[in-house]
Amino acid sequence: MAAVSLSVSTVTPLGDRVFVKVAEAEEKTAGGIILPDNAKEKPQVGEIVAVGPGKRNDDGSRQAPEVKIGDKVLYSKYAGTDIKLGNDDYVLLSEKDILAVVA
């Protein structure tokens, strides 16, 4: 079996899934206290780096995704599958788990 090299450019989501680069977690509190890694809250915001072709309708046609590459999005806390590529964190999630596009 050949080894597979994963990078952002080689990941193509299927269906209505999107691939999101997770924003960096806050390093310190508003009061200036530096947080250890195990105390940091998992971010729920990130930037879309890949988008699937869209959900398939009952008649076989595709429903175009409402989001696009480059959109900053807010998503459900426990949604998707966490993926680490290099030093960056990503999440692969369904479009329905996206709560909002952030301006």
Swiss-Prot record:
UniProt GO MF annotations: ATP binding; metal ion binding; protein folding chaperone; protein-folding chaperone binding; unfolded protein binding
Annotated function: Together with the chaperonin GroEL, plays an essential role in assisting protein folding. The GroEL-GroES system forms a nano-cage that allows encapsulation of the non-native substrate proteins and provides a physical environment optimized to promote and accelerate protein folding. GroES binds to the apical surface of the GroEL ring, thereby capping the opening of the GroEL channel.
Keyword Cytoplasm part of the UniProt annotation: yes
UniProt keyword terms in alphabetical order: Chaperone, Cytoplasm
InterPro entries in UniProt: Chaperonin_GroES, Chaperonin_GroES_sf, Chaprnonin_Cpn10_CS, GroES-like_sf
GO CC field: cytoplasm
Family matches, as SMART domains: Cpn10
Keyword Chaperone: yes
Organism classification: Bacteria, Bacillati, Cyanobacteriota, Cyanophyceae, Synechococcales
Coiled-coil zones: none
Family: Belongs to the GroES chaperonin family.
PANTHER family: 10 KDA HEAT SHOCK PROTEIN, CO-CHAPERONIN GROES
Any single biological process term in GO: chaperone cofactor-dependent protein refolding
Protein name according to UniProt: Co-chaperonin GroES
Principal subcellular localisation of the protein: cytoplasm
Subunit structure: Heptamer of 7 subunits arranged in a ring. Interacts with the chaperonin GroEL.
Gene3D superfamilies per record: GroES chaperonin
Subcellular location: Cytoplasm
Cross-referenced CDD domains: cpn10
